[in-house]
Amino acid sequence: MSFLDRSFELHFNERPYLNHFSYLFITKTTRERSRSRSNFSILCRGNIIPKEVRDKDAVSRFLESVDQFERILNDSVFIRLERLTTDEIVGTPQQAGLIEKYFSLSQQDTTTLKDIQMSASEMRIGDDILCVHTLSDVDDLPGSVQTDTRYEKYSTDRSDCRLSFAAPVGLMLSCDHIYNQFLFIDDSAEILQRFEKTARNMHSLSKYSCANQLNKQWIDAYLDEAHSFGLTAIRCHCNVMAWSDSREKLKVIKNDTGSALALMGCKPRYNTIDAPALYWAGIPGGEGDFPSEESFFTFVEQGVCFFTEETNYADSLSPFGIKMADRTNGKPLHLDISDEPMRRGITTNRNKLVIGPSGSGKSFFMNHLVRQYWEQNTHIILIDIGNSYKGLCDLIHQRKNGEDGIYYTYSEKHPIAFNPFFTEDKVFDLEKKESIKTLIMSLWKRDTEVITRAEEVALSMAVNLFLEKIKEDNELVPSFNTFYEFVQGEFRGILEEKHYREKDFDLTNFLNVLAPYYRGGEYDYLLNSDEQLDLLNKRFVVFEIDEIKEHKILFPVVTVIIMEAFINKMRRLHGVRKMIVVEEAWKAIAREGMADYIKFLYKTVRKYFGEAVVVTQELDDIVSSPIIKDTIINNADCKILLDQRKYINKFDSVQSLLGLTDKEKGQILSINQANDPARKYKEVWIGLGGVQSAVYATETSVEEYLTYTTEETEKLEVTQMTEKLGGNMEQAIRVLAKEKKKKK
């Protein structure tokens, strides 16, 4: 585990969060049992097994129905059921089962036996005091219910963030609790017949009381609804069981639970009398013992509205991924946005498009992503403008004792320099030869000049002969200088032997045009680097091109070398993950006629276990280049958006261009709307193939923050402390992080 990985783990160590488990129990009961009241519970009787349970045909029909129900839900793709085994329900000597966990109010695999105490005023399980709120009467319910509702904290005037109707009593209720939802499927026809009989009785008694007439009207409305739309009549009950071992905390929990029910439009009802019976009926498989007087009549459609549909963010079931955090409770997450989505058929490639305005945390997120990819043995080439990756690259360079973390940048004192003719193994495959020819061609001919077939053949011959000489002559130092001298001397003689005419290949013109790159020329440093550096085996390489992006000579050369370096990795590193990240520099690359290369890259890199990532501030930049627009958007199945509030009024065009759904739009516009002030983080939306999307928190340790930061003052702090500690950047980050933690 690396220093930064360890600091991430320690940052989240022992952080409390609300965990969520969901169980669906389908219980077979009898007509008599379903009508029984709380005073007829099995707690009060000796014989607990009804005779219908011993009817093999009835049991067989029930199990067939359950199998069919399971198959229907699993086939829907949206939800998946996993059937519990007998050991998982009743437990084993080594591991607690679900029933044991229920009786101890714990999800731990090892549980302790706890006394259950019941009195008229409260119910205790061990040290915990139970607090039960119920929805068991129609009078306590709102006038209407719905499957989902608008969550104001994450909504804007232009977007909705939708949560399930019962979300306030699910994960939004931040205390230990169980939310039970009971749906009793009785004989619907029999229920409706009973209601019709009751309505007639009410009509007969209406002259004695207006209330009877009013009740008849309500019953008639229920019957009309059932018959008009063919609805199934059912009974329903919901309750929230919360607990605490402290009476003071229990008061707060009681108020919080009541407030959560009020948010649903329900009247909070605190239940003490029936708490034991409700707790008993909540035992897995014990729902048949539910007291019927605690239920109300409704229809299936309205009953399922009381289900909670949210759960904790799940870790990816993959060994590869990045570490993010749950936006609501700060739980650390393992997230795979490259391999797992492809395995599951959600995406068809690993390419990514990252969009975030200045100040949205775009560079910070990208630092976090590439650092973790690098630590998982990914080869990464970054093309940057603005020194966003300088801190991370320096740290890697120091950790690897200069063997990795290569940072190319241009300054007057230290101009950028390469050696395209050097490889550690002296292997020059077809791609390498073609890239050298392309490089020399770009130096020799302008874009407007046409190269003839004869010139192309001569240049190809010169390159191939020189590369052969490098392999044979161990004394020869490969560089542009020695190539120039080879062409000037040996190759001139070869051309004369082959009777090349000047009009076919003007050697003098060739040498004159390339003279500025030869020893003593204006750009003699560019292709004659003294560093024997082969980028093929360097896993983290940054090209910072801010100073040369407008340079007509240097920029095209650097661009060709960058592309050659990545293609070389693509072709030669088999079974190794490759990533190229093009920050704002892609605009300059496209302008220099490299749009076709990006197009090729996005369509081809998938076949070589690679991924291309383009990072931009505004979508308009991409739209302005038709080739880029069609290629990047259509071939980047992973789209990553940061805070878009600056563009909220024109987000419809972004939605249309990226093909986002209204749900995805709502998620994106909810970014950073209700961040927890106790945590330092920014949110990011990740969408995969138009199928799966969520908002995550980019929350890091102080050590990671100091490594990634692009704030000038903070970068300066790290630099000064590094110098003070004799150049040890890792130690400098540790010292500064310790100081900042003390100030909190």
Spell out what each predicted region is.
Residues 1-304, 308-309:
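Extended, folded cores of ATP/NTP-driven motor/assembly subunits in large transport
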Residues 262, 374, 606:
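Anion (oxyanion) recognition and catalysis
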Residues 338-360, 364-371, 380-392, 406-414, ...:
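Conserved P-loop NTPase motor cores
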Residues 28-30, 244-246, 324-328, 337-339, ...:
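Short, flexible loop/turn elements at secondary-structure junctions
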Residues 9-13, 427-481, 626-744:
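P-loop NTPase motor core of the ASCE superfamily
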Residues 13-18, 228-233, 325-327, 343-346, ...:
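Short glycine/proline-enriched loop/turn "hinge" motifs that connect secondary-structure elements
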Residues 170, 277-333, 339, 390, ...:
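P-loop NTPase motor domains
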Residues 22-25, 379, 539, 578:
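The start of beta-strands in P-loop NTPase/AAA+ ATPase cores
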